[in-house]
């Protein structure tokens, strides 16, 4: 029968695997306690970094529906369960490993798919959520600025058009009134020879 503490540990790991947006497996052999504290601090609230036994991790992963981690569960293993920005945490682990070669990225899991070490490092090369949002906000701001310039230009163009029309009207009133005056005049008719002859007969 399994010990209650192991059952509880497996249940906790399973829940973390299931709820995490991604999980990165690392080897921490030789890292000091202070170095591990620094690593946890650098990851911030976006990830939970925990040491776990390979046997319990393997069971928990399978219960969470994750297959294919056996090759990564060799040697001392610590897992970074990411609940925030995946790219940011992956970048933090990659940078920490550069400064502390004793930390080795083994691989990971994302969306139920097992990743190798290179794939995890590629995640670190992606732009973080904050950077993407900043770029999006910058793009929207630029578009709004362009729209504002266009809308502000419309009234001024109309005003310039009216001003030009007023100047023309002052110089030549027919620009505005010509059409109206023409409409008040009676239309001229042209008499045909037959009509003239008929008029002459009547007069006789």
From Swiss-Prot:
Molecular function as annotated in GO: large ribosomal subunit rRNA binding; structural constituent of ribosome
Keyword rRNA-binding: yes
A GO cellular component annotation in the UniProt record: large ribosomal subunit
Region named Disordered: 170-204
Keywords, comma-separated and alphabetical: Ribonucleoprotein, Ribosomal protein, RNA-binding, rRNA-binding
Feature: compositional bias, Polar residues: 192-204
SUPFAM superfamilies: Ribosomal protein L10-like
GO BP terms, alphabetized: translation
PANTHER family, per the entry: 39S RIBOSOMAL PROTEIN L10, MITOCHONDRIAL (PTHR11560)
Subunit structure: Part of the ribosomal stalk of the 50S ribosomal subunit. The N-terminus interacts with L11 and the large rRNA to form the base of the stalk. The C-terminus forms an elongated spine to which L12 dimers bind in a sequential fashion forming a multimeric L10(L12)X complex.
Function comment: Forms part of the ribosomal stalk, playing a central role in the interaction of the ribosome with GTP-bound translation factors.
Annotated protein name in UniProt: Large ribosomal subunit protein uL10
Organism: Cutibacterium acnes (strain DSM 16379 / KPA171202)
Gene name, Swiss-Prot/TrEMBL: rplJ
């Amino acid at each position: 029968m399994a010990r209650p503490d192991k059952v509880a540990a497996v249940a906790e790991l399973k829940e973390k695997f299931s709820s995490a947006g991604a999980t990165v497996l690392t080897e921490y052999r030789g890292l000091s306690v202070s170095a591990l504290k620094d690593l946890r601090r650098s990851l911030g609230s976006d990830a939970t970094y925990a040491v776990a036994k390979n046997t319990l991790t393997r069971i928990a992963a399978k219960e969470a529906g994750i297959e294919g981690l056996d090759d990564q569960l060799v040697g001392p293993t610590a897992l970074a369960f990411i609940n925030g920005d995946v790219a940011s945490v992956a970048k933090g682990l990659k940078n920490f490993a550069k400064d502390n070669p004793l930390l080795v990225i083994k691989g990971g899991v994302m969306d139920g798919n097992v990743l190798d070490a290179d794939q995890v490092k590629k995640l670190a090369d992606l732009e973080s959520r904050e950077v993407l949002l900043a770029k999006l906000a910058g793009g929207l701001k630029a578009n709004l600025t362009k729209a504002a310039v266009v809308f502000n230009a419309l009234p001024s163009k109309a005003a310039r058009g009216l001003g030009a029309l007023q100047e023309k009207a002052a110089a030549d009133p027919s620009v505005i009134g010509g059409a109206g005056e023409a409409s008040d005049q009676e239309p001229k008719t042209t008499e045909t020879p037959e009509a003239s002859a008929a008029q002459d007969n009547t007069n006789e």
